[in-house]
C-alpha cells in the first residue's frame, strides 16, 4: 500500500520512476487490489494458526467480543476492506471517491503501526523492520503531501479564464491566459484544475488533458461535462481565476521522438491530447509520418473533426487523418486501420 501511495503522489521528481503520472495511475490500480488480496491472505493464515491454538472465532473477527479480542486490529481490517471496495465502485461520484481515498491513508497508518509494533517476524528481524519503517514513512509522507500539502506546495500556475467555447455534445473548451508566469509543458500532458471561487468545490482538483500547443500563450483544456464539477464550468465568467497544477503525464510526442512513424487513435474525448500534438506539429520542423484515427459513435459526435481538417493537416509532417464512426464502420481494429 505504501508503494501504491507513492505512485500517485504527483511529485515531478518521482514521475520518471513510473514513466509519467498516467502510467503511475495504471500501476496504482494494480497495486491497490493486490494489497487487499495480500491482506486477506495474511489474515486467513493468521486466523487458522490462532484457531489451532484455541482462540475463538469471535475473538478473531468480531470487535469487542471479549477482553482478549484484538478489536482495533479487526476494525482496521474491516475498514481497509470497505474502503478498498468503495475505491473501485464506478457508481460513486468523483467527490466521494476522492474522500474515500483520503480516508484510506489514515487507515493505512493505523495498519502500519500494527505491523511494526506487533510481535512477529517484522519485530524479530531488524533488517525487515527497518525496511518496513522506511516504506511506512515513504507512504505516510506521500499521503501527507498528496492530501494535505499539494494544494499549497504543488506546481501551481495562476490563470484567468478567457472564454468558454461550447463544442456541442456536452464538450467545452476552457481557454485561459496566464496571470504572470506561463506553464511550460509538452504536448499530450494533462493538468489538475481548481476553481477557487466555485462554491462548495473550492479545494477540489480535477484532471483534464491539454489540447493546445506549448508554443501558444493561451492554455486550452477540452472537457466533457459529465459530473457535478464539469457541469458548472460553462457558467464561469471571463476573468475567473483558475489554479492550474502541472504538467503531468508521460504520454507525449517527445517521448516517441525517435520514431518516424506514429499511429494515433483517439476515441471520443480521448482525442484531446492528440489535438495538442497536432497543434505542435504546425511549428515543429521535424518530419514524421502520422496516422490519426478519430473514433466516435457517429459523425455528430466528432466535434473536433472540422478543426483537425482545417487547422492541422497542412504541416511539415505528413498526416493521414481518418474519421471512424463506429455506427457505420464498426469497432476500430488494428487490421481495419492498417488497410484503410
Residue ranges and their predicted role:
Residues 261-265:
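Conserved beta-strand elements of the Class I
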Residues 153-243, 259, 282, 288, ...:
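Ferredoxin-reductase
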Residues 271-285:
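Histidine-anchored nucleotide/phosphate-binding helix
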Residues 1-174, 179, 326:
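Membrane-embedded alpha-helical bundles that constitute the cytochrome b-like, heme-associated redox core
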Residues 247-258:
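A short, basic/flexible loop-to-alpha-helix module at the beginning of a structural domain
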Residues 106, 110-116, 123, 228-229, ...:
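Reductase modules of NAD(P)H-dependent flavoproteins
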Amino acid at each position: 500500500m505504501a508503494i501504491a501511495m507513492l505512485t500517485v503522489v504527483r511529485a515531478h521528481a518521482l514521475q520518471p520512476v513510473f514513466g509519467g503520472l498516467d502510467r503511475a495511475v495504471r500501476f496504482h490500480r494494480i497495486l491497490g487490489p493486490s494489497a487487499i488480496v495480500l491482506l486477506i491472505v495474511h489474515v486467513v493464515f493468521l486466523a487458522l494458526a490462532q484457531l489451532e491454538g484455541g482462540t475463538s472465532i469471535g475473538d478473531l473477527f468480531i470487535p469487542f467480543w471479549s477482553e482478549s479480542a484484538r478489536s482495533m486490529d479487526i476494525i482496521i481490517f474491516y475498514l481497509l476492506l470497505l474502503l478498498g471496495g468503495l475505491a473501485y465502485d464506478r457508481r460513486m461520484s468523483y467527490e466521494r471517491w476522492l474522500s474515500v481515498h483520503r480516508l484510506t491513508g489514515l487507515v493505512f497508518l493505523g495498519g502500519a503501526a500494527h505491523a511494526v509494533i506487533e510481535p512477529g517476524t517484522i519485530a524479530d528481524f531488524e533488517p525487515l523492520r527497518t525496511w518496513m519503517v522506511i516504506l511506512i514513512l515513504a507512504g505516510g509522507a506521500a499521503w501527507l503531501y498528496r492530501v494535505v500539502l499539494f494544494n499549497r506546495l504543488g506546481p501551481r500556475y495562476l490563470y484567468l479564464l478567457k472564454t468558454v467555447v461550447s463544442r456541442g455534445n456536452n464538450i467545452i473548451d476552457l481557454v485561459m491566459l496566464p496571470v504572470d508566469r506561463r506553464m511550460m509543458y509538452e504536448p499530450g500532458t494533462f493538468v489538475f484544475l481548481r476553481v477557487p471561487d466555485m462554491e462548495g468545490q473550492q479545494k477540489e482538483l480535477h484532471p483534464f488533458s491539454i489540447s493546445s500547443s506549448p508554443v501558444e500563450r493561451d492554455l486550452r483544456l477540452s472537457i466533457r461535462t459529465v459530473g457535478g464539477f464539469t457541469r458548472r464550468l460553462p457558467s464561469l465568467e471571463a476573468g475567473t481565476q483558475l489554479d492550474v497544477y502541472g504538467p503531468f503525464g508521460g504520454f507525449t510526442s517527445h517521448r516517441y521522438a525517435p520514431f518516424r512513424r506514429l499511429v494515433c487513435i483517439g476515441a471520443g474525448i480521448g482525442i484531446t491530447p492528440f489535438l495538442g500534438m497536432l497543434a505542435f506539429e504546425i511549428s515543429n520542423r521535424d518530419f514524421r509520418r502520422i496516422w490519426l484515427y478519430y473514433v466516435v459513435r457517429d459523425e455528430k459526435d466528432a466535434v473536433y473533426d472540422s478543426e483537425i481538417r482545417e487547422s492541422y493537416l497542412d504541416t511539415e509532417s505528413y498526416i493521414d487523418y481518418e474519421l471512424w464512426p463506429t455506427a457505420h464502420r464498426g469497432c476500430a481494429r488494428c487490421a481495419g486501420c492498417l488497410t484503410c
